[in-house]
Amino acid sequence: MLKKVFKLTVLIYSILSLPIGEDWMGLLHAQTITRGPYLQQLGQNGVIIRWRTDVPTQSLVTFNIDSPNNGGATTPKIELDNLSTTEHIVQLKGLQANTKYTYTVGTETKPLASGKDYYFITAPSPTDNRPINIWAMGDFGDNSTEVYEKNQTAVKEQYLKNKSNYTDLWLWLGDNAYCCGTDIEYQRQIFDFYGSNILGNTAFFPVPGNHEYYETATGQVDKKINYFKVISVPTKGEMGGLPSNTKEYYSFNYENIHIIALDSYGLDEGKYRLSDPQSKQYQWLVNDLEASKGKSLWTIITFHHPPYTKRSHDSDGEADLVAIREALVPIFDKYKVDLILNGHSHSYERSHLMKGHVGKSFTFNDYVHPTQWANGKYEKKGDSRPYINKDEGTIYCVVGSAGRLDWNGDPNPHPSSVYSNISIGGSLLFTINDNRLDARWVAADGVIRDNFTVFKNVNKTEKKTLEYGEKIRLTSSWKGSHLWSNGVNNQDFIEISPRKDTIISVVDSLGFLKDNFQISVLPQPVVLTEFPESVQVCVKNSVSVPFSVKNTQLDKWEYQLELSDANGSFTKPLLLGRTNKSPFQIILSDALPEGKNYRFRVRANADFFEEVPSKSFSIATPASLGFVGNKVMPFDTTLTLNLRFNGTPPFTYKITSLPEATTQARELSLKVKPTAAINYTIEKVTNLCGVGTVLSENSVSVLAPLSNEESSEKISIFPNPISDEITIENHTAKPIIGTLTIKDVRGKQVLQKNVSFNQSEKVLLSDLHAGVYIITIKSASLRFSKKIIKN
């Protein structure tokens, strides 16, 4: 059990006076740290410090607020655990948020680790609003080849050269120590490799990869692998997030960021992977996202196996990657996850800001899946553009080349990638500063080969109403450069005391961002209806009508929404609704006539308001379409189809066998040239109100063509109409030897037979249904067609 001690105790005499036994050997032995110290679970008010010694000793941490200007006046604090062990885990609690601490570890008789590398900065509160620096990478701890070892070394060195002053979070993306995540591999390829200048002050939050589970044959089921012995992660909701009660997956909050760490390879209950909706992990993920919805501005999820990847692993062909994409991407879309970080593929890949893609790579559509058509780069180069006002969509980053670097021979990156690199390793450094995220992929040669920036909740227009002479502070909606329209530069706020109505704007130096502040100074209260100009509104559709007020508070009054007549006059307005907040949500009645000069007007329940109606807009009605005239037509080489449209043009329509077309006309005659019996059927009609109604008069039938009766005087057929049998008489001098064919009016053949006769031939037609048919007789010297009717 831990106990707090607030002064150092000298034990020299006590130790020397005791008999030397096994319990005291650790105190008298020349103890040495063989691993660490390293930081775990660094949060707002606490941290876990771990280390390993060569012999069992007690565990003592001495810590203090780092205040360079206090002359060392504060008293260090001590956390002591007298239990003798080689695996030391000490938790510090009650720390101040957003504060730098220094620490040493050892025993009451001997410090074992101290110096400039051993410090940490606690997490800020959600309102502290300082930049959070994050380092992410996967597939890094591998010294099995010279290429991997050199790559890992170069990536580390370039991180140290390019990192910010302090790295708050180090995200491990799985396959952290090759080949199998054993204790000696973690020791040699992570703890020894990265050393105290990183591990002594940078808290890591890991996920396992498949290689962590390769340590044992049963690890996926029983979880008895070294990885879980190395880590101390927040499983009980200690740092926010939903408790998972397992080290396999967990979540936590860090300032305004919600981070979820998942296990994409272990098995729940010995059979369910993360992608299986029956797994506890899948269900926990959904519940955690639901519980955190709206509480953090940013959501980041880490796990090993990527849903989109090419050229190292292939997410088209590997079943576990397909399953993850199909099962998890809809969840990420639903909860508007901002960033997914993966490893597994030994490359770097960064996708569009995208949503809705669960199929194979060839189904990715540039016009469908990206939610913003931008490359994410915040720079004045070519078509570069950052992601502005990100809402829906997720960026997927594969950061799996911090050690291993492999190419499967496929030259083509995944179609969703904005940038992809298989030729050089690197790691991802990114900073979240309030509503701005800036990421850099720093390659092993120090070149920043990819970067992207995401802004949320920027480019705002704010309307302010002031008393005359009142001072107001205007603050921009982003972090970065600022050029104010009143000449102030390089600060994110200004304070002004306007004496008249004015508009103040602020832009960034690159021209992507702009806030507008519309300031009204006194006098008369005004209510403005802010419906867009020249839009077309469909009846029976929900309409949002926003409004605002000047020179008063909106919530002080009740308001009613009125509609003008079709000429824009409010002589006899139609009352549409009442509310005390903006916007109005209404549905226009389908009894309203079409018109292009309607206006909305919002009125307050006081007679001294100036009322500014909306600009003119149009009211439109849904489309409907049907044929007029004959619905059955005899065959001709050119026929006319008559159409009648109702609703607001233009109309887009589709008729069987004819191309889709658009018209402004409400009455339309179409010239068609059939070549056989056909049914012209209206398939659909649309206008700006969407899919319209196809009326019951939706089809015109054209009868089968009749050939020229070149020899009709030489052959007769009777009776007509017929009952069960017809007689064919030959009035020529030659016998008729050929074929007899009967077709219905749609051109479908119902009978064909060979005939050979001199004077007459009887044909039995009792099997035919009642209707109209075309009979054709062909021989070497004769062709004859005639319409017959079967009763």
Where are these regions (language model features)?
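Acidic, histidine-bearing metal-coordination/catalytic regions of metal-dependent phosphoesterases
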Residues: 17, 27-142, 146, 153, ...
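C-terminal outer-membrane/trafficking sorting elements
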Residues: 21-26, 483, 558, 710-718, ...
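A short beta-strand segment in extracellular, disulfide-stabilized domains
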Residues: 48-50, 469-477, 542-547, 637-645, ...
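Extended active-site neighborhood of metal-dependent phosphoesterases/phosphodiesterases
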Residues: 105-115, 119, 181-295, 314-322, ...
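Residue-level detector of functionally pivotal "anchor" positions at catalytic/ligand-binding pockets or at interdomain
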Residues: 459-461, 522-532, 620-623, 697-718, ...
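Solvent-exposed loop segments of extracellular immunoglobulin-like
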Residues: 478-483, 555-559, 647-654
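Surface-exposed, flexible coil segments in extracellular/virion-facing regions
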Residues: 485-496, 570-577, 658-670
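Solvent-exposed segments in extracellular or luminal domains encompassing
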Residues: 492-505, 585-592, 662-680
